[in-house]
Structure formats: C-alpha cells, structure tokens
From Swiss-Prot:
It comes from Oryza sativa subsp. japonica. This is Nuclear transcription factor Y subunit B-2. Residues 39-45 bind DNA. Its main location: nucleus. GO terms for cellular component: CCAAT-binding factor complex. Residues 66-77 are annotated as: Subunit association domain (SAD).
C-alpha cells in the first residue's frame, strides 16, 4: 500500500499555498520541496500528449499549469476522503473513500467507471499476490502470460487501457445504463 505525506493538508493550506509561509517566502527548513508537491512533469506531459493529435504541441507553461492543477485536485479529493475517515475514526484512506469524495465533490460521472477499474485492479493485484505465495515467493517471468493478469505490469497496463477509454476530450454520458 502506498502511503502519502499529507502534511500540506494541515491548517487548510492548499497546494498553491504549500511550501510558503505567511509572508509568501519559501520555507526555511523542513518545508515541502517542489518535487514533493507536484507529480513529475514528464508524467503530466505523457498523459497530455495522449489527448492531442500526433503532430500537436503542448507549451511548457500549459504543462506546468496542469501539473499544479492535478496536484491541487489530488489534494482536494484526498482532503475530502480524509475528513470522511476522521469522522469514522479511521486512519487509512482507501479507494472507496476516494470514490466517495469524488462523488461528494461533484465528480459523480467518474465514480462508476472508477469503481469498475478499482475492482479489476484489485483482482489483478490479488492474483499477483496469490501467484507470489504459490511457489518460492517470487513470480516467474515465464509463467506470466499476456492475459494472466498476475504481474504489476498487467496492473500498469490497465491504467493505459482505462484512460484511453475515458475519452479525455468528451464527457461520457449514459442514459441510466452502466
């Protein structure tokens, strides 16, 4: 399980304010470094390139702006999920908490597809853990076929398949059918 340092959420500071004191100056010591506040620009760029034509170009400031927006979005959703966990006296935020938060914050149209993705992801991870425990504790490369779903690369492949099906540029509307 991946653990996140959510120190920037304390005191109500958003991502745009994180890393600066009241005067707007960068922190002296122990503050949040920029690379800890934002996702890597290369990852942002790679995702953005999937949404534009092959010959399309993306300006550096557009990438940097989206990098900040994505980080703020993560903070926004995580903060809402954290509030839910605190009310329920739990310390660990799970996938369902994040989906609940997204629905609460007005992103309802993403909740059902993400529930499906989360379920399939957990199946893949579960298969991977079972395969690892079955033998000598390691997953054999030659036993993992393209459809076995038993490796972390399968889980990573799911991300690409899922995001391609999301239709970045066009909202997905359904007439009550899921």
């Amino acid at each position: 399980m991946m653990m996140m340092d959510l120190g920037f959420l304390e005191g109500g500071a958003g991502m745009a304010d994180a890393g600066h004191d009241e005067s707007g100056s960068p922190p002296r010591s122990g503050g949040v470094r920029e690379q800890d506040r934002f996702l890597p620009i290369a990852n942002i760029s790679r995702i953005m390139k999937k949404a534009v034509p092959a010959n399309g170009k993306i300006a550096k400031d557009a990438k940097e702006t989206l990098q900040e927006c994505v980080s703020e979005f993560i903070s926004f959703v995580t903060s809402e999920a954290s509030d839910k966990c605190q009310k329920e006296k739990r310390k660990t935020i799970n996938g369902e908490d994040l989906l609940f938060a997204m629905g609460t914050l007005g992103f309802e149209e993403y909740v059902d597809p993400l529930k499906i993705y989360l379920h399939k992801y957990r199946e893949v991870i579960g298969d991977s853990k079972l395969s690892s425990k079955a033998g000598d504790g390691s997953v054999k490369k030659d036993t993992i076929g393209p459809h076995s779903g038993a490796s972390s690369s399968s889980a990573q492949g799911m991300v690409g398949a899922y995001t391609q099906g999301m239709g970045y540029m066009q909202p997905q509307y359904h007439n009550g059918d899921t």
